[in-house]
Amino acid sequence: AMAISDNIIIMNKGVVAQMGTPEEIYYHPVDEFVADFIGEANFLKGKCSTIDGKYAVLDFEGKKLTVPLREGGMEKGKDYTAVLRPEAAKLGDEGGLECKVEVSCFMGSYQNYHVKIGDTLIKLEDHNPKNRKVYKQGETCSLLIDTDSLHVL
């Protein structure tokens, strides 16, 4: 549907959940159902601790996760969920959120990873593994997230 449509409608239990272009729905889903329905999604849940300009900080699994401000604003002390698509992050040796590699699998055109931060499992796809270090199961590394690629629900 996404490849041949100008607009699509996502329905949940017979009710329109979201209508828009494929890009709008993929990058700006209205809720977890739509985000999960339209593609692979990771849900990073945390409490807002800081708001500064266009960004906020969520306390996520004991770490600080910078996110773009949600449309309509955000409030300190309130719980939010940030949607992270598997292709919107990569692994590195430092500079991000410390994580542990649970799964590392070469898939041909990409390296598939499952990493854990606290109790949260995060799925990643590194679409250029030949030019980067490949992390193995059991290794500790750093999850590098492009802040502006996150979408806060």
Predicted regions and their residues:
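Non-catalytic connector elements of ABC transporters
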Residues: 41, 51-153
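Internal alpha/beta loop-helix hairpins
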Residues: 2-63
